[in-house]
Amino acid sequence: VQALNNANIPVVAVDRSASGGTVDSFIASDNVTGGKQAADALAQSIGDEGEVLVLQGIAGSSASRDRGKGFTDGIATHPNVRVVGQQTANFDRTEGLNVTTNLLQAHPDVKAIFAENDEMALGAIEALGERAGRDIKVIGFDGTEDGLKAVTDGKMAATIGQQPAKLGAQAV
């Protein structure tokens, strides 16, 4: 970004903020509000009571930070829902599978998992096998095609939708 600034080229950031340089315009979903919506959907899916896990995105990224803040703030309004484990899975499906497998060994009685994106949620669903959607609810984020299919198939309780085409159009 700094190189673009030095060349007097306008910079428009879409979906993620820049950590250095100056951005002329920033277009993104409200990830904090989305995180709160995810917390409410998760709590509702488990009858507002139980232990849950959180799969975090890339450490320090604006999306992970904001979605995590929204979820933490939102889940605080549900005192009988407790986050018992959380770990980064870097917005990656395979890491979501592996991290979920490890967290479930330490916390076998969880009722739900919030993943800060659909890719990690889909990895969690793979780790859960037949328990996904039945015994353990999964909430994703992004509203990807695969995520929406998992909701339709009953494997994912919800995904927080984004509209990337609209974000791109606004950026242009």
Give the ranges of each region predicted by the language model.
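A residue-level marker of the well-folded mature domains of exported/periplasmic proteins
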Residues: 1-172
